[in-house]
């Protein structure tokens, strides 16, 4: 008997995968992630690159400060990834510090699709433009942005602009958040 089951080791989100691939090609070596569901496609995309040093930090504020330290030490941006809602807001203190010290940093916040925002749902907050006062550049990537040229340009612009301080990308991700793979499901006798 065959069935389709969720494969939690892959992502079908082209946007998450393409942004990470482009940053790795630009020279990304460090990333910091915090546990969450909405950011799973980003975490899976990062994990698919064995050359990356990935640090897991349970607290988003701490995660952003670890990424800030990586940028200070290496002189290159580290990527810090958070799930949606108030978790994303916790990147703020490190982003402000990176802004004033001109430390390279890329903050990527996962978000609900635009049509599922502002409904009073859990883990929802206005994330687009959240850090505009303290970033060199910010961008909202819509949930169905799959044009490779556009995604490459967003990633390259973020990388370039982050050389003199933090940038913020708010990436809308719809469900399912994990990839789908066809696998064999054994029949129990």
Predicted regions and their residues:
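N-terminal alpha/beta PP-like core and its mobile active-site loop of ThDP/TPP-dependent enzymes
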Residues: 5-189
């Amino acid at each position: 008997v065959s069935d389709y089951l969720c494969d939690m080791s892959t992502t079908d989100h082209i946007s998450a995968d393409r942004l990470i691939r482009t940053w790795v090609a630009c020279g990304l070596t460090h990333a910091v992630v915090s546990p969450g569901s909405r950011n799973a496609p980003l975490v899976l995309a990062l994990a698919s690159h064995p050359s990356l040093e990935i640090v897991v930090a349970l607290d988003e504020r701490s995660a952003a400060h670890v990424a800030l330290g990586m940028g200070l030490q290496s002189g290159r941006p580290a990527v810090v990834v958070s799930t949606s809602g108030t978790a994303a807001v916790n990147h703020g203190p490190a982003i402000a510090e990176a802004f004033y010290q001109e430390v390279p940093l890329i903050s990527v916040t996962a978000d609900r699709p635009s049509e599922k925002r502002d409904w009073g749902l859990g883990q929802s907050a206005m994330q687009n433009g959240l850090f505009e006062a303290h970033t060199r550049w910010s961008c909202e990537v819509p949930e169905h942005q799959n044009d490779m040229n556009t995604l490459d340009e967003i990633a390259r612009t973020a990388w370039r602009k982050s050389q003199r301080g933090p940038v913020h990308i708010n990436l809308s991700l719809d469900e399912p958040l994990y990839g789908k793979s066809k696998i064999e499901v054994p029949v129990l006798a």
